[in-house]
A protein has these predicted regions:
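Bacterial N-terminal signal peptides
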Residues: 16-26
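N-terminal soluble domains immediately following signal/targeting peptides that reside
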Residues: 30-172
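Bacterial N-terminal signal peptides that target proteins for export
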Residues: 3-17
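Intrinsic disorder/low-complexity segments
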Residues: 1-5, 10, 22-23, 26-30
Length: 172
């Protein structure tokens, strides 16, 4: 081999090696190994309202929205056009009911930060919450290992609930 063809072959080998390293590093990008959401639900007695914030990994939410919307690709960002999709999804998977009625959930909005999306809701509520059932099946149709943790603050004291596949409804 001539000197110039040897240098060319060496450059190609290095380039191939760098591309291989880049491909491997991007395909093994650090992804979380668990699927969890955390919900804070607080009763504001003077306002007679539940204030709710749900923290979900953004990539998981994007996948859940995609599966609910015929594989459409979603990219969650602040000030995007996805609020109607997020609202519809949350209304389907987060409900508060008793034997007679379903509480009206008001979607306040969402906020994206780093790797998580915060979803904000309010539920006007003037009754005693005991005996009401809260469904939190967010992302359970997408991930079999999804766990949704909820911290509930009532005037009677705090409670914590865990929701998972097969246990998506808890009695308050």
């Amino acid at each position: 081999l001539s000197s110039s063809s040897y240098k060319f072959a060496l450059k190609i080998t290095r380039l191939t090696f760098l591309l291989l390293i880049f491909w491997l590093s991007s395909s093994f990008a650090p992804m979380h190994q668990y699927h969890v959401s955390v919900t804070q639900m607080k009763y504001d007695k003077p306002a007679k309202t539940f204030e709710i914030s749900i923290r979900i990994f953004t990539d998981d939410l994007e996948k859940g929205l995609s599966e609910e919307n015929n594989k459409r690709i979603f990219t969650i960002k602040n000030n995007d056009q996805n609020n109607p999709f997020v609202e519809r999804y949350v209304r389907k998977h987060f409900t508060l009911t008793n034997a007679q009625k379903k509480a009206e959930i008001q979607y306040v909005g969402k906020e994206e930060e780093a790797d998580a999306t915060w979803i904000y809701l309010e539920i006007p509520f003037s009754e005693n919450p005991e005996g009401w059932k809260l469904q939190n099946s967010i992302l359970m149709e997408t991930f079999d290992d999804q766990v949704n943790m909820m911290n509930l603050k009532l005037p009677s004291g705090p409670k914590t609930f865990l929701y998972k596949k097969g246990q998506a409804v808890q009695t308050l």
